[in-house]
């Protein structure tokens, strides 16, 4: 199906709007995890006014996108890098389990969904979008600006995974044997890590083989 997004012009209460809410917060940043031993994504606090974030609009009618300062990942003082965004698809764990095998979210890990529909949507780092953003590219990562990160995360929201199926080589996963659930994308061994090598071909897919970046 063809899907088209546009800024909302009517809010959940029926009032006219430009679809943008600017919320003042005392929080300097929102963290992915409060500590390295936690499975709770505390960054989701940006989605609730009670934790100094902003409440979602009806997720059955709106694609919510939160923009905030996402704290960089670090473990015991060792900085691991900056997360520019993440997304929850618009389905929950119970529905995914009940319809396993049907097209709900193709080949999407159930533990990466949420039963709380109020967190479903996209979160973006504030440096990763806007043509007149004075903070854009402050880290030198031009690959993420001008909405590229938004396109990437909205694709996740719609159920598209990374083409290496999110295999983790660190834990011994073989990306060539882990699929993304989409038949016409080539297998890829691992993430390209921002290197745009259009000739790279890390997996052999037989007669229908294509480079990783097509």
Q: Where do the model's predicted regions map?
A:
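Metzincin-family zinc-dependent endopeptidase catalytic domain
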Residues: 1-201
